[in-house]
Design a protein with these regions (language model features):
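Beta1/beta-strand and adjacent pyrophosphate-binding region of the FAD-binding site
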Residues: 1-11
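N-terminal FAD cofactor-binding segment of flavoenzymes
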Residues: 17-79, 374-385
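Dinucleotide-binding Rossmann-like beta1-alpha1 core, especially the glycine-rich loop
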Residues: 47-57, 82-98
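Helical element adjacent to the flavin cofactor pocket in flavoenzyme catalytic cores
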Residues: 96-115
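Predominantly flavin-linked oxidoreductase catalytic cores and closely associated redox partners
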Residues: 109-266, 271-286, 290-291
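A glycine-rich dinucleotide-binding beta-alpha-beta segment and adjacent secondary-structure elements
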Residues: 277-281, 285-343, 350-352, 370-386, ...
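Internal hydrophobic alpha-helix adjacent to the cofactor/substrate pocket in enzyme cavities
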Residues: 349-370
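C-terminal auxiliary extensions adjacent to catalytic cores
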Residues: 393-435
């Protein structure tokens, strides 16, 4: 007996390892290296294509709670992340090359996982299968899925540029974490005064963008979690100053004042020789990226080792298609996992892979599938993507808004987060004891 897993991204890797850890053989299909998508840069598995940040570590935060739940479910990728984390204040950021290498080595060294490096164009019939083909599902498989379900939605994600550390002019920058969190040098901050910001802003909104297929270049449909900086800027001159360039919590030690606007740079790898432009996912043409981003004083001589790109993203109308256990409503041997289900974010995708893998095993063993309690973050996201009352389905990442309200809701935001997390982890522990 074996279970098929299609795709070796974050969700597929988690699903495969959950299945193998239960003693069931896995046939894992991955089209790389024979075929790649526009956003992929390597032949490795679990490739992080948008950012190297896995979001907040604090268990009292929604993102931190999600990761703690994953740890308690024996997450393979959380172990990989912990082994290659880089300083990032209160966030868990990783060296993405090492992260993908660890994931790839773990998968390929597992005796129960047989990897087939080939493109899948049709989902195997009469076999238990987890489809984790991702937001960059190949066109033949995407078309097969569309024919199977009659509808799907598409939009675009964007990735931020990366510059070399040595090309950052520290005469115009300073090291600090917002509100003095972390070790103090986790971020390089590139301040701008009002005049510099206005010059940059006007250049940004008028810069030429790369062409997109099946999408309006001037106003593409994008999701908030990875919105191109030029699209965000179109909303108004102050939008960036209240978004990725917000100066709050930062004081320029050279002036003693808070800057008008700040671009933060975060370490891309453990070596600290590359930095990514935080929140600056973009679809500008490469020469335009060089021209516009070099208007930021600290980046006037920046060496761009990778320019930002924008790529297609496809997801299901999951409330009409999936159950909360990630199985298809009319086919309990077929599961979907990852961003194709409408969960938004790296760890959210990985978490859905954990659940799909567990439930695929339970079907193989003749057991009933499980859904975690809806007061856990993973359980709440599982409920969200399968909520048939949702009329216009949009992707969702971890946030406390998807959880049931607290009985005694603290007024203080931090206390409220701690209460949500304490309740969730207690609920998860109790649930896991009974299965």
């Amino acid at each position: 007996m074996h279970i098929n897993v299609i795709g070796a991204g974050l969700a597929g890797c988690e699903a495969a390892m959950q299945i193998a850890s239960r003693g069931i053989k896995v046939h894992l299909y991955e089209m790389k290296p024979n075929k790649k998508t526009p956003a992929h840069h390597t032949e490795k598995y679990a490739e992080l294509v948008c950012s190297n940040s896995l979001k907040a570590m604090r268990v009292e935060s929604a993102a931190g709670l999600l990761k703690e739940e994953m740890r308690r479910l024996d997450s393979f990728l959380m172990k990989c992340a912990d082994a290659c984390k880089v300083p990032a204040g209160g966030a868990l950021a990783v060296d993405r090359d090492i992260f993908s290498s660890l994931a790839t080595e773990g998968i390929k060294s597992c005796e129960l996982i047989e990897v087939y490096e080939e493109e899948v164009c049709e989902i195997p019939k009469d076999e238990i299968t987890v489809v984790a083909s991702g937001p960059l599902t190949s066109e033949p498989l995407a078309e097969y899925i569309r024919e199977m379900f009659g509808s799907s939605l598409s939009f675009f994600d964007a990735a931020a540029p990366i510059v070399t550390a040595e090309s950052i002019d520290m005469e115009y920058a300073f090291c600090a974490s917002r509100y003095d969190k972390g070790d103090g040098d986790d971020y390089i901050n590139c301040p701008m005064n009002k005049e510099e910001y206005e010059t940059f802003y006007n250049a940004l909104i008028s810069a030429e963008r790369a062409p997109l297929h099946d999408c309006d270049v001037s106003n593409p449909k994008v999701y908030e979690g990875c919105m191109p900086v030029e699209v965000m800027a179109q909303r108004g001159e102050g939008t960036l100053r209240f978004g990725p360039m917000k100066p709050v919590g930062l004081v320029n030690p050279k002036t003693g004042h808070r800057p008008w606007a700040v671009l933060q740079l975060r370490k891309e790898n453990k070596a600290g020789n590359m930095y990514n432009l935080v929140g600056f996912q973009t679809n500008l043409k490469f020469p335009e990226q060089k021209r516009v981003f070099s208007l930021i004083p600290a980046l006037h001589n920046a060496d761009f080792v990778r320019y930002g790109v924008m790529h297609r993203n496809t997801f299901l109308d999951s409330p009409r298609i999936l159950n909360s256990d990630f199985s298809v409503k009319d086919n309990h041997t077929l599961f979907f996992a990852g961003q194709i289900t409408g969960v938004e974010g790296y760890m959210e995708s990985a978490a859905s892979g954990i659940m799909a893998g567990i439930n695929a095993c339970r079907v193989a063993e003749g057991k009933s599938t499980i859904t975690l309690p809806n007061d856990t973050m993973i359980g709440a996201l599982s409920a969200y993507i399968s909520d048939s009352s949702v009329k216009k389905f949009q992707p969702m990442g971890a946030n406390f808004g998807v959880l049931p309200e607290l009985e005694n809701r603290p007024r203080d935001k931090k206390e409220r987060g701690a209460a949500y997390s304490a309740r969730a982890l207690k609920s998860l522990d109790n649930y896991l004891k009974d299965i």
